[in-house]
Amino acid sequence: FVDTSDLDAVRKALKPNTCAVYLETPANPNLKIADISAVAALAHGYNKDIKVICDNTFASPYLQRPLELGADVVVHSATKYLNGHGDVIAGFVVGSAEFCNEVRMFGLKDMTGAVMDPFCAFLILRGLKTLEIRMQKHCANAKAVAEFLYDHPAVEKVYYPGLIDHPGHDIARRQMRDFGGMLSFEVKGGRAAGVKLVNALHLVTVAVSLGDAETLIEHPASMTHSTYTEEELA
């Protein structure tokens, strides 16, 4: 694993047996931004057969089009923004017709039997009709929250690519329509302060997901990563 926002690290990680480069941008949970075009150019320049796969869940296709930036394959958790209502579990793989046919006929479908049920498909199609207006509001809300937290005396650091001092701000501005609806932040006082904050909220739901109709918050160290050691969390 390498930090795909670091092009030198990506370059050094490429090996003769590399068959794919997988990146997520914006990345979960630190909102790091990878330059999709630059990563794709590096990978394809090293070996034209390397597949560049981009997880576009945090951006959605409304905000970012990785295929147009050089990626070969795009994956989405359709559970999130694409559906938008927190009531399905689904995923999308987007690519060339040739690649998708290989996946459907000779790949994952044959090995796992992974087929979306009709009602999930209906709900996602319904959600896609409002993706544009939902993403516009998600972005506006996230920016407002990020700017509020940025100036708050109890907040140590805010991770949001829409902030001008975010290290990936310029790349995000170039390859995204807007900066997304997700942000992370650190509060002063460490883990105990983070847990106290999450437990004190009333209008925000404590849950592990995103892209829902409600505002959600999670504290990874005590939730999704609660079994990790302090060294692993660091």
Show the residue positions of the predicted features.
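Conserved PLP-enzyme active-site core in the AAT-like
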Residues: 1-154, 159
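Conserved C-terminal alpha-helix-loop-beta "cap" of PLP-dependent enzymes
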Residues: 155-234
